[in-house]
A protein has these predicted regions:
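Conserved alpha/beta-domain cores
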Residues: 1-66, 70-90, 97-134
Length: 134
């Protein structure tokens, strides 16, 4: 698993994918916590979207990580932003939750959200769109 969390790793993601092409299994973790600090919060959606496009075109599975349903896992009540973020995680092959007293409930909630989102997301399209983040 290539954990992508720095500007350098984002810029080098195409090369990382090419280098790992012969090594199976291989996947990419979008480590959004450190990445937000590196690229700035205002660019997070753009950067993670382009990383998803690139991995999708290369048929590389993605782990959507860092602070997914974090408030819900720890306090039992999700924020509106967390719910939208969880819904957008449907584009990834895997979603990573942190530990907490409500993690089982978070798994159930996430399953319900992702099941409903399947019909709304375009996933595994055959064409790589233009990348603009680097």
């Amino acid at each position: 698993i290539a954990k992508i969390e720095t500007k350098k790793a984002i810029k080098n993601l195409p090369e990382i994918i090419v280098q790992a092409a012969g090594q199976q299994p291989f996947g990419v973790m979008i480590a959004r916590g450190d990445m937000a600090v590196e690229v700035g919060y205002e660019r997070m959606a753009e950067i993670q979207e382009e990383m998803l496009w690139l991995c999708e075109a290369a048929h590389i599975p993605v782990i959507w990580a860092t602070q997914v349903l974090e408030q819900f896992v720890t306090e039992g009540i999700p924020s509106r932003a967390e719910m939208t973020d969880a819904a957008m995680s449907e584009r990834a092959e895997c979603v990573m939750l942190n530990k907490g007293p409500f993690v089982a409930e978070a798994v159930t909630l996430l399953d319900n959200v992702l099941t409903r989102m399947q019909g709304h997301q375009s996933k595994k399209t055959p064409q790589l769109r233009a990348l603009h983040s680097w």
